[in-house]
Amino acid sequence: MHLARYPRRFIAHLPTPLERLDRLTAELGGPEIWIKRDDCTGLSTGGNKTRKLEFLMAEAELQGADMVMTQGATQSNHARQTAAFAAKLGMDCHILLEDRTGSNNANYNNNGNVLLDHLHGATTEKRPGSGLDMNAEMEKVAEKFRADGRKVYTIPGGGSNPTGALGYVNCAFEMLNQFNERGLKVDHIVHATGSAGTQAGLITGLQAMNAQIPLLGIGVRAPKPKQEENVYNLACATAEKLGCPGVVAREDVVANTDYVGEGYGIPTESGLEAIRMFAELEAILLDPVYSAKGAAGFIDLIRKGHFKKGERVVFLHTGGAVALFGYDNAFDYSGRWVA
């Protein structure tokens, strides 16, 4: 599959590392655990959205855009990476941030990703978390800018459309190359799934290469039927864009949404445990919104025997640790101070 046919802005630090997690493996006593470090993509603390933005921002440039616009939750990693990419290319960036948690915490609303949005020069405006179609809302705002003569390129939440998903088709190829070069037979790949683009791109790439590695997305927002439908539809559209329609079957798309908790962006006890385990055992930082819930599901499934001893499982780290600074009230380490 020849991805060089599609315009791309090479910004990410690729390939990202593939590391074995010896201490976490020993702690859980299950499969051999590896991690794909897409928290190390390089742009403004890294994260998975940079892969998508390489293709999306190249398209924006080709269309002559002088402004990009996107939307996401208050502590959106995607928004932060979009703002950073726009700064790198000399474009203006405007972001609609949806209040999905109702939190009044000052750090949640002004620190973490929000601070970096503004440091990168983006302008932001808020929307209530009342079930708005945020992509439609964004298009309304974009039309106002266009009426003033701006050339606006809009990017859907999470960068999740067929163009953005190409970034994770490429990631699938990258991982398979790493597995092959190191002689690693991988039995499963697990990651957090939200706006669908990461999982859709991965499954399209894996199926196109006949990898025969099951992919499991741990959901962070939508119920299982809706999440799987979103991923499947986007995977089909991505395969169509690539010229290989039908490469992804419905049964190839699997999501487990048992670890969402009270809702999107609201920390869970299992997610906080995952953050502590990864930090204390492997010096790896997760975020409470995406990667921690993905890791929580992964850990629980290991404990339940879903992944067997002797298997090799890769957890794809989607990044986002900067959001920890917006969730400081979720942690109490006062007992770590020694008088």
Swiss-Prot record:
<dbReference type="InterPro" id="IPR001926">
    <property type="entry name" value="TrpB-like_PALP"/>
</dbReference>
<comment type="similarity">
    <text>Belongs to the ACC deaminase/D-cysteine desulfhydrase family.</text>
</comment>
<dbReference type="GO" id="GO:0030170">
    <property type="term" value="F:pyridoxal phosphate binding"/>
</dbReference>
<feature type="modified residue" description="N6-(pyridoxal phosphate)lysine">
    <location>
        <position position="49"/>
    </location>
</feature>
<comment type="subunit">
    <text>Homomultimer, maybe a homotrimer.</text>
</comment>
<comment type="function">
    <text>Catalyzes the desulfonation and deamination of L-cysteate, yielding pyruvate, sulphite and ammonium. Is involved in a L-cysteate degradation pathway that allows Silicibacter pomeroyi to grow on L-cysteate as the sole source of carbon and energy. To a lesser extent, can also act on D-cysteine in vitro, leading to the production of pyruvate, sulfide and ammonium. L-cysteine, L-cysteine sulfinate, and 1-aminocyclopropane-1-carboxylate (ACC) are not substrates for the enzyme.</text>
</comment>
<keyword id="KW-0456">Lyase</keyword>
<dbReference type="InterPro" id="IPR005966">
    <property type="entry name" value="D-Cys_desShydrase"/>
</dbReference>
<dbReference type="InterPro" id="IPR027278">
    <property type="entry name" value="ACCD_DCysDesulf"/>
</dbReference>
<dbReference type="GO" id="GO:0034011">
    <property type="term" value="F:L-cysteate sulfo-lyase activity"/>
</dbReference>
<keyword id="KW-0614">Plasmid</keyword>
<dbReference type="InterPro" id="IPR036052">
    <property type="entry name" value="TrpB-like_PALP_sf"/>
</dbReference>
<protein>
    <recommendedName>
        <fullName>L-cysteate sulfo-lyase</fullName>
        <ecNumber>4.4.1.25</ecNumber>
    </recommendedName>
</protein>
<dbReference type="GO" id="GO:0000098">
    <property type="term" value="P:sulfur amino acid catabolic process"/>
</dbReference>
<keyword id="KW-0663">Pyridoxal phosphate</keyword>
<dbReference type="GO" id="GO:0019148">
    <property type="term" value="F:D-cysteine desulfhydrase activity"/>
</dbReference>
<dbReference type="Pfam" id="PF00291">
    <property type="entry name" value="PALP"/>
</dbReference>
